[in-house]
């Protein structure tokens, strides 16, 4: 059930926090290093709780979008800035956007969150480069995020947006599921596939009329 899966997800960072705290208490762990892990896992748990709350709001029909006219390029640049600390280890993020503003009616906070989630995944799995492109036609803007990693296991592709799905990597979660729900709230679509190198995520949402 949802609650069983949620409690399992929360248990993982809690166990790490408890383990490192006990290590400090027993004097068998470096205090600074253990404190860093505790802080990281606390942040991870906070993010997970927020995702669980948001997905439950969507399920109950209580997630309301606060729409405004937004230049999607600025939102994408915000996403790049958000993941730059993760990419600092040698991953180049290469943007390719139109020169003119690309206006969409969106909930700036929620859509930025969805894009940043895909970007952060891409940075983690990229070897050296993450390409972020934006294209627009009369009806839609298409955002494409492609890494140069190993791609997504073929057996995982049909389930990549499923809640709590544990794929070949052994990791599970609801980040991608929440991303899909946010895109759907914007009357858009999102899909994942493998390219010649790495994974490709494509988001399509309506442009402003």
Give residue ranges: language-model regions:
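Short beta-strand/loop element within the Bergerat-fold HATPase_c
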Residues: 129-139
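Conserved catalytic submotifs in the C-terminal HATPase_c
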Residues: 66-69, 92-102
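Conserved micro-motifs of the catalytic ATP-binding
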Residues: 60-65, 103-106
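Short conserved segment of the HATPase_c
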Residues: 152-164
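Short alpha-helical segment of the dimerization/phosphotransfer core of two-component systems
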Residues: 40-48
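Short alpha-helical Gxxx[C/S/T] motif in the catalytic ATP-binding
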Residues: 175, 179
């Amino acid at each position: 059930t949802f609650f069983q899966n949620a409690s399992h997800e929360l248990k993982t960072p809690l166990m790490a926090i408890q383990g490192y705290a006990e290590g400090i208490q027993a004097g068998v762990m470096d205090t600074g290093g253990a404190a860093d892990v505790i802080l990281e896992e606390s942040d991870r748990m906070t993010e997970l709780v927020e995702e669980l709350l948001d997905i439950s709001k969507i399920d109950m029909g209580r997630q309301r979008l606060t729409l405004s006219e937004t230049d999607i390029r600025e939102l994408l640049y915000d996403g790049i800035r958000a993941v730059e600390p993760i990419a600092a280890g040698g991953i180049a993020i290469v943007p390719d956007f139109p020169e003119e503003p690309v206006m969409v009616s969106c909930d700036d906070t929620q859509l930025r969150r969805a894009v940043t989630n895909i970007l952060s995944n891409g940075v983690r799995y990229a070897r050296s480069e993450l390409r972020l492109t934006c294209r627009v036609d009369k009806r839609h803007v298409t955002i494409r995020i492609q890494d140069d990693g190993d791609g997504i296991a073929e057996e995982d592709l049909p389930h990549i947006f499923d809640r709590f799905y544990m794929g070949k990597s052994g990791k599970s979660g609801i980040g991608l599921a929440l991303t899909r729900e946010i895109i759907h709230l914007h009357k858009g679509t999102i899909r994942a596939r493998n390219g010649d190198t790495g994974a490709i995520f494509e988001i399509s949402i309506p442009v402003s009329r």
